[in-house]
Amino acid sequence: SEESKNALLGGAYFIRAYRYYMKTLQYGDVPLVLDELTEPKVDYYTTTKESIWLKMIKDLEFAAQHVPEANKVKGGQVTKAACKHLLAKYYLLEGRFDDAIRITTEIINGGVHKLCTERFGSNKSVADKDVIWDMFRIENKSLPENTEGLLLTIDRYGMEGNTSGTQVMYNALPYYGLTGVIKTPNGANGMSDAAKNEIGI
């Protein structure tokens, strides 16, 4: 149907827009590829990041209209709120602050997502923990009770073939446990989790 076609297309637009968000913030101007490649291509040229942002905004506005809400899709699929959230980030890049406020307010007031206030999940009876602790347990992340999840990566804890990917709350640095792998220019260990450890350059 036209509805399912647009939902699928909107999900693909989200994935592309997410990748271009990361690329343009890391590298600036990059090649913009909008058509399927069927043979090798080597004559790429860059497109200004501002032009890319405008294209991604247009795509995400389409996606935000056509991708279903989280309660209407299977876990792991792109959701309407995820599209709106990424669209808000693009609006901020463009200085369109009122549009960013409008679209994030739609998520907040949309009735699907709300802040978790009640304990839930596999260890909700552990007395010295709270709802934040519950939300970041590996086995709780994709439960329906976790109403704060806009887009979930499904990685079933304890099942064959799973990875530790959903254990990570936020990556801000290279993994400090790789002692001896990351080196400073003079060859010293470049990462440490020791308290007050100074790393000489």
Language-model features, listed with the residues they occupy:
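Aromatic-anchored glycine-rich loop motif in surface-exposed flexible loops
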Residues: 1-78, 94-99, 109
